[in-house]
């Protein structure tokens, strides 16, 4: 597996925070022994302002009979103090957030002092509404500064936030409110992206009509578009009238390092989304530490992570890590193509952005439009590029490096998960030549292993399942209200390891290449969707008897969604029924669950025990009709020819 590599530009190397030799030495030291790992993280914890410094660094056991993950357990802190107060003391007027609105005429610069005041006002108002330490608060927000204000106000008063992506449907929102038993919802009248409006408040109203949402006592509504929305007298309150007149001082809640910080729901291989729980001290230590390492951060950086706050990247690397470090973070409400595909470049120039962290999906979409739009901007302020969410294909990497970055900016291809809290694998800039598509090296304290399906650790160049043979401070602690599922999902299949659910190749240089999910989870545009969740949505449609969902190659999104559907005998396969099914799924889960291909079939390939053989469907969805592997366990191998005919016919129509 020999791969082309790109050396780091000499001018970048000259100013890099760390050299290849320093990385090798520090990494070796950070994993030398459990004591050495603790010593490393004790040193990194010095980046945090603690109310009470921890003396116990880690207490971890992956033994299912005596399972525990604790970091800095006797430490006390408040994250909002780390993100705000300490910078207000040292540099109050430095921009904390640069907000770029959906329309290019809209932007706002918010200093650390102003952000601190806004957070304190909302924190005080939330306390008056009866929100206490440990209470859950659901945020369903557009990409506006109030979203970050609300996250930080929760951390100020010790409430646990659960941010739900504004593109999710009312039903998805309702299910998350029910699972978290939230006391408060914070939303906006509407969201606006690409000049299209999303009815956020209307979706909240529909979600709160669902049984089991009685825990919600109030809804705070931010005025964004000004369109009229129904406000229910006692329950609903306008954000701006609520915070006006509140004090600019809000006493921060003293939090134990292991107190819950936030819930973030992510798709699993079973239908029900799981509430990933992160705690306070370990999460912020890991977030800040990895941010500084991976992005080679300098004092005057203007840093733009394009992720929505509804995803984990928007939590860790758009909000908490940059603000904890005192770095200016850029927040963009819109989409890359509005008003034209030149928008990203114009934003880079307008705010003199130095570091850009975005998803391969966005890069592929821009690349498809050619170089002209990108070349409308200068982009000379950029010094570092990053990618996140899914493995980047080498063609997109090349274009990002050469065209967007002008062949001078290193590209950090980062691998991590909602569950890991922060980046786990990445080529720390200045330490290694880059290989397009490779996540390269583990970060400090992280011990990746490649293991086969029998759980045997493989040496040298190898391909298998990616597991982590240790704990780290940013690791999730449990699935909210379902610890048994947490243990089963991550620690049971390969005892003694954290199982990532991803496949990996390690090349002869020891560098890691992520190959994609090995479970029934799809990675669409860098966002995870469970096949079971989509299947149950399809089967909920009255015309459908059974469905199987698999991933398929997609030019822009990396992975598309393909559904094989058996209709009830009374139904007839038509194009209009396909459109109706797609609308149904999008309304139940959200537009992200768009079905790219729907094949109406009479049978599904099943084993004698009744299991659907998804690998066959994956091959067919990718247009591979021969060499389908071992079919001996199929109950009826003649179904393959029938399926191949359906897929071939449909694909011929669409081409």
UniProtKB/Swiss-Prot annotation:
It comes from Psychrobacter cryohalolentis (strain ATCC BAA-1226 / DSM 17306 / VKM B-2378 / K5). Belongs to the ATP-dependent AMP-binding enzyme family. HAMAP family: Ac_CoA_synth (MF_01123). GO terms for cellular component: cytosol. One of its GO terms (biological process) is acetyl-CoA biosynthetic process from acetate. ATP binds at residues 389-391, 413-418, 502, 517, 528. Its cofactor is Mg(2+). GO terms for molecular function: acetate-CoA ligase activity; AMP binding; ATP binding; metal ion binding. This is Acetyl-coenzyme A synthetase. It comes from the Bacteria. Keywords: Acetylation, ATP-binding, Ligase, Magnesium, Metal-binding, Nucleotide-binding.
